[in-house]
Amino acid sequence: YGDCLSKIMSFAGYDVTREYYINDAGNQMYNLGVSIKERYKERCGLECELPENGYHGKEIIQLAESLYDTYGDSKLGEDIPFFKEAGLDILLEGIKKDSDKFRVNFDVFTSEQSLYDRGFVENTLNKLKNSGKCYISDDALWLRTTDLYDEKDRVLIKSDGNYTYLLPDIAYHSDKLNRGFDRLIDVLGSDHHGYINRLRSSLEMVGYDSSKLEIKILQMVRLLRNGEEVKLSKRTGKTITLNELIEDVGVNAARYFFASKSLDTQMDFDLDLAVKNSNENPIYYIEYANARISSILRGKEIPKDIKFSTIESDSAYTILNKLLEFEDVIISAASKGLPHLVANYLFELAGLFHSYYSVEKIVTDDEIYTKERIALINAVKVVINNAAYMLGLILREEM
């Protein structure tokens, strides 16, 4: 979603920075370090005692294996921070590698820990305390976010002295606004619905315009195989990684299927449909349209200054009208944050071309007739490929 939206916005003329926020601080990172160390001990032939709140997935075993390959058993005496940092480095390298494979590019990687190291979190805490909106209850420090948009007040510092996620998140968004961005778009998972109003309220309490922040909530994805849901659980180790999905269905299918659904729609990803070589599969249908046009245009000169004097059929006029819609679709998708508008437009345009191709000859002995239709289908190809670019698709020229 985020990569498609950034490409659409760039195409529409926005100056876009793609940023990845690394959650490398807090208890979950400590649990990661513990989990890796236990798996490393296991790899070294010692007893493994994974904590209940640790990570049980196969990727932790792979991380431990990687560390063993590098160090042997020489790191058995290291404390949790070593395994946390080593694991983070390997995971981040994998994220970058998988993102690149998925054609997702980031301009900036920002570390949560760096916000602590640079004093941003403490500065933010002091600003909030000075705002008069903080109070102590049950030995915890609370922020009175109900004074603005939130349904309940939020804890900043827990009774055990640990910071909640909210505090560094306020610092992070403050930092982005300090860098001069006019519009911030967060792309978050479906468990973050309550996050929107608490963050907006918090930003206003430290002096920022919260209307500059937009939070896009992605829905959970159900993977289907043979018509049945593939059950997944990160904690129990039953997962399908992005890399495995790409290997299974290909980058084009994965990207198109994800982009084609609106944010408020449950995403059912049919793994069988995604690899079908038939018109039932939308990415196949789109690629087939592009390949058909490419085959017709191959070796032909693209005419200019065409008047379309011989264009008379309803199917041709329908295509022309659809092409005229393209600019409005891009503007709407960019301004409203709706990449699925481009995905749906692309599918519809491909369908109109297939219909046109089935009822009207394109190449005939009539030179003017042929030139006008060559110009028409070339325009279709240009728009198909522009839309495909914005969705991160690389379409085949032959099938």
Task: Please provide the spans of the model-predicted regions.
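Non-catalytic interaction-recognition regions
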Residues: Y1-M399
